[in-house]
Regions:
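Canonical Rossmann dinucleotide-binding motif of NAD(H)/NADP(H)-dependent dehydrogenases/reductases
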Residues: 2-33
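Conserved mid-core segment of classical short-chain dehydrogenase/reductases
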Residues: 90-108, 127, 131-139, 158-161
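Residue(s) in the substrate-gating loop at a strand-loop-helix junction
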Residues: 149
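Conserved Rossmann-fold SDR core element
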Residues: 81, 170, 180-189
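Alpha-helical segment proximal to the catalytic Tyr-Lys
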Residues: 127, 178-179
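A short, exposed helix-loop element centered on a Lys and neighboring polar residues
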Residues: 122-123, 174
Length: 189
């Protein structure tokens, strides 16, 4: 896919891998909507990146907010060409730690953000991407990138929740790639 002039959403876009991805896409001539919960960092990065960047504070696990967000993207940009899912959390917690056992609520929070949030974003992104035919000279409508981790295969002590979440992201990406290939949408980790 040629990046120049394309519209991308980058979750976790205010810092880390998401911010680096946004910088790279902007450098290639894309328009990028940064999605993050950290408003201060998101707005700062938007100013740094200039007119081709927009920031939106969004909880990727909120179904209604995400649906509304993609409606706004379509209204403003008329299309979507890509989604890069970088939003995630990676707290360290041992199952049998000094302060007690691993909290179930923390485990569920990690899975909710890293897995459910990724799925929530990609399903609405796929719906929008599939509405539009590939641009002239291109074979695919768009691309969805889900951030995985070596922790999916080789998790370390204290990474139980994070490793489980990344294993789930890896596991859902292949069937999604097979399904969405029919819609000319590439999905990968």
């Amino acid at each position: 896919m040629k990046i120049q002039g394309k519209v991308f959403v980058v979750t976790g876009g205010a810092s880390g891998l998401g911010a680096a991805t946004a910088r790279h896409l902007i450098g290639q001539g894309a328009k990028v909507i940064l999605v993050d919960m950290n408003q201060a960092l998101g707005e700062e990065l938007q100013r740094e990146l200039g007119e081709n960047a927009q920031f939106k504070s969004l909880d990727v696990t909120d179904e209604q907010a995400v649906q509304s967000f993609f409606q706004e993207v379509e209204a403003e940009y008329g299309q979507l060409n890509g989604l890069v899912n970088c939003a995630g959390v990676a707290p360290s917690a041992k199952v049998l730690g000094r302060d007690g056992i691993h909290e179930l609520a923390l485990f569920q929070k990690v899975l909710n953000i890293n897995v459910s949030g990724t799925f929530n974003m990609l399903r609405f992104a796929a719906q929008l991407i599939a509405k539009y035919e590939p641009q002239v000279g291109e074979e695919e409508r768009g691309v969805i990138v889900n951030t995985a981790s070596v922790a999916a295969y080789d998790g370390q002590i204290g990474q139980t929740a994070y490793a489980a979440s990344k294993g789930a992201v890896v596991s859902m990406t292949l069937p999604l790639a097979r399904e969405l290939a029919r819609e000319k949408i590439r999905v990968m980790t």
